[in-house]
Amino acid sequence: MPELPEVETSRRGIEPHLVGNILHYAIVRNSKLRWPVSEKIKTLLDEPILSVKRRAKYLLIELNQGWIIVHLGMSGSVRILPEEQPEEKHDHIDLVFRDGKVLRYTDPRRFGAWLWCEDLATSSVLAHLGPEPLSAQFNAQYLYQQSKNKKIAIKPWLMDNKLVVGVGNIYANEALFSSGIMPDRKASSLTEQECDVLVNAIKTVLTRSIEQGGTTLKDFLQSDGKPGYFAQELFVYGRKDKACLICGHTIESIKQGQRSTFFCRHCQHGEITD
């Protein structure tokens, strides 16, 4: 699933091609995504693109009339292509621009979304989101205050968008490894010092992934069609039964909330004793 670094990589890739350009028209080949494609998108004609932003894992494309809100779902990606490029099986949406370029949305599993909103303040999908992880608002004091009396395990807690947005499974695993914190500890067990280390680890791993164009494990492609290269820098995610790159001990895995969690008993400390 594309997480925050992949969405931010996509935003940075498409922004120079969209902002200041004129959306000539939209082609919707398949409306059956996670939610039906908003009818308004199908009717857009000759609309200038004012900005391309990101909130959590949503791409926000600003036009005079409102906003296109894009979620990449489990397997979605957006690419900039020439208008004459033939569409393929899973190419569901094109935004065709006056300069002959196309923003093409590809989504094999169709769990993504293309929504329309006149005012972001009224958008139900953007309501109740926590702070951005790379913002000053997300800091050790905030995380420590939020952790008090929380009996939930740390890793699924970090993945709650009401706490902080965009820390998906890959990056939660990697940040906890970097912090030396076991993923099944209760959130309430975190000390102020551990919160400081953990916040810094989250910011570092997300920033590094963005610099590498995100993580491609299967479907994700950058806007130029290239994969993300952060997969080559993963310490624990997807490395069950392999040697830890730091200490040589075996990487183990458990299930937390139907998600795979990866850890090293030697480098991380906390609850797991089996």
Swiss-Prot record:
Gene3D superfamilies: 1.10.8.50, MutM-like, N-terminal. Keywords: DNA damage, DNA repair, DNA-binding, Glycosidase, Hydrolase, Lyase, Metal-binding, Multifunctional enzyme, Zinc, Zinc-finger. The active site is at P2, E3, K57, R259. Binds 1 zinc ion per subunit. GO terms for molecular function: 8-oxo-7,8-dihydroguanine DNA N-glycosylase activity; class I DNA-(apurinic or apyrimidinic site) endonuclease activity; damaged DNA binding; zinc ion binding. DNA binds at H90, R109, K150. SMART domains: Fapy_DNA_glyco, H2TH. It comes from the Bacteria. One of its GO terms (biological process) is base-excision repair. Its EC number is 3.2.2.23, 4.2.99.18. Its cofactor is Zn(2+). It catalyses: Hydrolysis of DNA containing ring-opened 7-methylguanine residues, releasing 2,6-diamino-4-hydroxy-5-(N-methyl)formamidopyrimidine; 2'-deoxyribonucleotide-(2'-deoxyribose 5'-phosphate)-2'-deoxyribonucleotide-DNA = a 3'-end 2'-deoxyribonucleotide-(2,3-dehydro-2,3-deoxyribose 5'-phosphate)-DNA + a 5'-end 5'-phospho-2'-deoxyribonucleoside-DNA + H(+). A zinc finger (FPG-type) spans 235-269. Involved in base excision repair of DNA damaged by oxidation or by mutagenic agents. Acts as a DNA glycosylase that recognizes and removes damaged bases. Has a preference for oxidized purines, such as 7,8-dihydro-8-oxoguanine (8-oxoG). Has AP (apurinic/apyrimidinic) lyase activity and introduces nicks in the DNA strand. Cleaves the DNA backbone by beta-delta elimination to generate a single-strand break at the site of the removed base with both 3'- and 5'-phosphates. Monomer. Belongs to the FPG family. This is Formamidopyrimidine-DNA glycosylase. The gene is mutM.
